[in-house]
């Protein structure tokens, strides 16, 4: 199945969701509303029922709100639900994006540079979150340059350099691949502590 040329809403309904390298939150909406936007993709309510505030729509809206709060709790932002998303620090905005992506109930979650701009503590928290996502049975596809994070969370790794695949395999194979070492690591690195 190809998703090329499909609209974002259609892709999400197919079970594919993503976050962006550059944070894309709705800054003037609350943290909760940002996640609810992601959940609305799975909504059955149409424009007319939403506009008329019909009973079924109100029930669905309540379910969407509850689901959004569960996703905020999953990423550790439940206490920030009423704050404006634009007021969150970068690390929390990235977590918010993950919560919004998870609200679509994806089978596949694409994370584009999720550790970009994060400090060590935030990156460790992100790794723990990704492990919890994987435990939920969601496939995570990661585009990332933080090799410690990649080695920590990955079962399989494909390495590209200037658009060309240079290696593919298990983390242990990748960390010892001479092309990967030359392109990204600069020297052999001991990841055995991870």
Residue ranges of each PLM-predicted region?
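Glycine-rich phosphate-binding loops of nucleotide-dependent enzymes
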Residues: 1-194
